Amino acid sequence: PDKDFIVNPSDLVLDNKAALRDYLRQINEYFAIIGRPRF
């Protein structure tokens, strides 16, 4: 299970809404510090 998590964590995150919400919160905090990327 740990190996699968390292290889493809995104699927596990998307399957868990609580984890997804926390994941997005961390990304928002990260970009708030370094500045948002240009797409």
Curated annotation (Swiss-Prot):
Described purpose of this protein according to its UniProt entry: May have an important physiological role in neuroregulation.
Domain of life: Eukaryota
Family listed: Belongs to the NPY family.
Alphabetical keyword list: Amidation, Neuropeptide, Secreted
Official protein name in the record: Neuropeptide F
Disulfide bonds: none
Entry's localization field: Secreted
Pfam families linked to this entry: Hormone_3
GO cellular component entries: extracellular region
Signal peptide residue numbers: none
GO molecular function ontology, one term from the record: hormone activity
Main location: secreted
GO biological process: neuropeptide signaling pathway
Residues with Phenylalanine amide modification: F39
